[in-house]
């Protein structure tokens, strides 16, 4: 028993010396590695924490494909959080100071999170492959429950490979500058060689081959769909176009994953090469630097994904810019001022329309009451016939750019309207001298209808107009049109079935005037019957915009156009 005990003690002492043995390298080599490890740890922890924060704070980002991205960020975060601090402290001490148990725990966590990242990228590739090449099957299988199960399987698969060295299949030992630990790929034994080969195949090479296969066929599927659309041209079915758009959307997510995979593979490739060199029996040609540098590069794979998302993923950038004030430079909103101005202008117009509509309803109610009172006082005989006033209106387009420019245009046109109104009043006075005065009840009804016409005209002008009244082309054309089938006499004594010559002349000349002036014209009919209804018509300009009829009297009583 004594020799065996001595042998065990000797092995324990050798193992302890193996953990505390320093490598004969300059101190600045340790400090240089410590600097890079600290940078990697800081960026890895901060960047992946921001990725998780962005995806958890924005509901639009919490979709099924992004579950794998969040899992990737969680794995990289834990990798940086558990590896960098211990690595940094050991580099400052120039040796491993946490003992054998600490070395095994450190190596176990590093293997667990590293393998999880690689297998998770494989799961992302398979998910994109199914969605793009087999969309119907993907719709049946994609669900929150199945995605959660897939992520759980990724972790279980990684856990199995990480636990193997702890149960006797290979082992965890210090590597490189003796400031970090990993599985024993240096010792040339059957156990170590078999574990190294199986690990490299089932964790690195086979997943990489499957990823390459998935992206190759994704690319071919997208190219085939694009060629089908180009070949069919306008005869392409709507379902084909929708499918092409859906595939292109999924391809954008696949491209992000592809960039992540490429960066990850490039980070771990040097470490895989060193491992295979040792497995082939040429570990003696590897220096401590050639073992440590690939390990640092592999751990740097945790910092790339946040930068990739910040560059490519637009929603991720916008979410961080909205949630984190110091990161607003990621998504500068150049159109914010324009959008605010547009909203304020629209709100202003809506408020004007609302206020004008309320005023019109009040005036309409008052006009109806006065019309009813006039009807009772004068009798129904006074309203046996309806007098209609015909007039054409010429409208000119203006530029609706700002409220200030619009008010300036209205103020310039007010002087011109005053002159036209004075001229019309003089003509009406001359005409009224040759005809009898209408009854008081008729005057009151006409006044109420005129007020209602003015209010309705203001309502039409309150909306964003493209045409504004600048002058009125004609006067009242008739005073004596009567209802069909009735032989009545109006106030001036002319027969009820007699038509005004000026009206006939006016309607004959309307097409010629439109063609000559190339100006849209419209007739405003203002009935003076007992219902006091006003019809507003709209004219369409050549470019499809709507022109609204505006009464000149309304412009005198109201400043809002």
UniProtKB/Swiss-Prot annotation:
Pfam families: 7tm_1
Acidic residues bias: start-end ranges: 550-561
Compartment(s): Cell membrane
Gene responsible for this protein: opn4a
Record-linked CDD domains: 7tmA_Melanopsin (cd15336)
Membrane-crossing segments per the record: 35-55, 69-89, 105-125, 149-169, 202-222, 256-276, 292-312
Positions of modified residues (N6-(retinylidene)lysine): 299
Matching InterPro entries: GPCR_opsins (IPR050125), GPCR_Rhodpsn (IPR000276), GPCR_Rhodpsn_7TM (IPR017452), Opsin (IPR001760), Retinal_BS (IPR027430)
UniProt-listed SMART domains: 7TM_GPCR_Srsx (SM01381)
Sugar attachment sites: 192
Protein name: Melanopsin-A
Gene3D superfamilies per the UniProt record, alphabetical: Rhodopsin 7-helix transmembrane proteins (1.20.1070.10)
Tissue expression per record: Expressed in retina and brain. Expressed in a subset of retinal horizontal cells as well as a small number of amacrine and retinal ganglion cells. Also expressed in a small population of neurons in the suprachiasmatic nucleus (SNC).
Lipid bilayer topology: Multi-pass membrane protein
SUPFAM superfamilies xrefs: Family A G protein-coupled receptor-like (SSF81321)
Annotated GO CC locations: plasma membrane
Similarity-based family: Belongs to the G-protein coupled receptor 1 family. Opsin subfamily.
Keyword tags: Cell membrane, Chromophore, Disulfide bond, G-protein coupled receptor, Glycoprotein, Membrane, Photoreceptor protein, Receptor, Retinal protein, Sensory transduction, Transducer, Transmembrane, Transmembrane helix
One GO BP: visual perception
Gene Ontology MF terms in the entry: G protein-coupled receptor activity; photoreceptor activity
The UniProt record lists the keyword Cell membrane: yes
Disulfide bond annotation, renumbered to this chain: 103-181
DNA repair among keywords: no
């Amino acid at each position: 028993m004594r020799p065996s005990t001595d042998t065990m003690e000797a092995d324990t002492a050798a193992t302890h010396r193996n953990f505390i043995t320093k490598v004969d390298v300059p101190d600045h080599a340790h400090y240089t590695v410590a600097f890079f490890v600290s940078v990697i740890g800081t960026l890895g922890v901060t960047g992946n924490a921001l990725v998780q924060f962005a995806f958890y704070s924005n509901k639009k980002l919490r979709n099924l494909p992004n579950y794998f991205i969040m899992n990737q960020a969680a794995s990289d975060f834990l990798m940086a959080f558990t590896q960098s601090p211990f690595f940094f402290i050991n580099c400052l001490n120039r040796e491993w100071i946490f003992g054998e148990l600490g070395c095994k725990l450190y190596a176990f966590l590093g293997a667990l999170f590293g393998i999880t990242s690689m297998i998770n990228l494989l799961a992302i590739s398979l998910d994109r492959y199914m969605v793009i090449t087999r969309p119907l099957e993907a719709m049946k299988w994609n669900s929150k429950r199945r995605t959660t199960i897939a992520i759980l399987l990724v972790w279980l698969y990684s856990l199995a490979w990480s636990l193997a060295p702890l149960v006797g299949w290979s082992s965890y030992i210090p590597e490189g500058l003796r400031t970090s630990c990993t599985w024993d790929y240096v010792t040339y034994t059957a156990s170590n060689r078999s574990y190294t080969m199986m690990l490299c195949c089932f964790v690195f090479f086979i997943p990489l081959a499957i990823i390459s296969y998935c992206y190759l066929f994704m690319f071919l599927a997208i190219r085939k769909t694009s060629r089908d659309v180009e070949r069919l041209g306008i005869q392409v079915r709507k379902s084909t176009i929708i499918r092409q758009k859906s595939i292109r959307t999924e391809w954008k997510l696949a491209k992000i994953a592809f960039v992540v995979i490429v960066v990850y593979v490039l980070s771990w490739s040097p470490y895989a090469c060193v491992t295979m060199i040792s497995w082939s029996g040429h570990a003696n040609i590897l220096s401590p630097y050639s073992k440590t540098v690939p390990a640092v590069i592999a751990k740097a794979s945790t910092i790339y994904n946040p930068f990739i998302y910040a560059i490519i993923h637009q929603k991720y950038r916008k979410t961080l810019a909205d949630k984190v004030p110091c990161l607003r430079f990621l998504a500068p909103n150049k159109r914010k001022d324009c959008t605010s101005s547009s909203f304020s202008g629209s709100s202003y117009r809506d408020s004007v329309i609302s206020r004008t509509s309320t005023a019109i309803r009040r005036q309409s109610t008052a006009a109806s009451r006065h019309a009813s009172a006039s009807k009772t006082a004068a009798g129904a005989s006074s309203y046996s016939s309806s007098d209609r006033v015909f007039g054409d209106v010429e409208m000119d387009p203006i530029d609706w750019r700002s409220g200030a420019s619009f008010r300036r245009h209205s103020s310039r046109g007010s002087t011109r309207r005053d002159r036209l109104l004075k001229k019309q009043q003089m003509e009406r006075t001359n005409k009224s001298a040759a005809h009898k005065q209408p009854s008081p009840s008729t005057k009151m009804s006409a006044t109420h209808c005129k007020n209602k016409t003015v209010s309705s005209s203001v309502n039409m002008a309150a909306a964003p107009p493209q045409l504004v009244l600048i002058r009125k082309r004609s006067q009242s054309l008739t005073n004596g049109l009567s209802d069909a089938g009735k032989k009545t006499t109006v106030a001036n004594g002319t027969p009820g079935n007699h038509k005004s010559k000026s009206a006939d002349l006016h309607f004959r000349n309307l097409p010629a005037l439109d063609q000559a002036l190339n100006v849209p014209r419209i007739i405003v009919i203002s009935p003076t019957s007992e219902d006091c209804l006003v019809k507003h018509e709209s004219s369409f300009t050549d470019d499809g915009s709507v022109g609204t009829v505006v009464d000149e009297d309304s412009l005198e009583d109201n400043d809002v156009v």
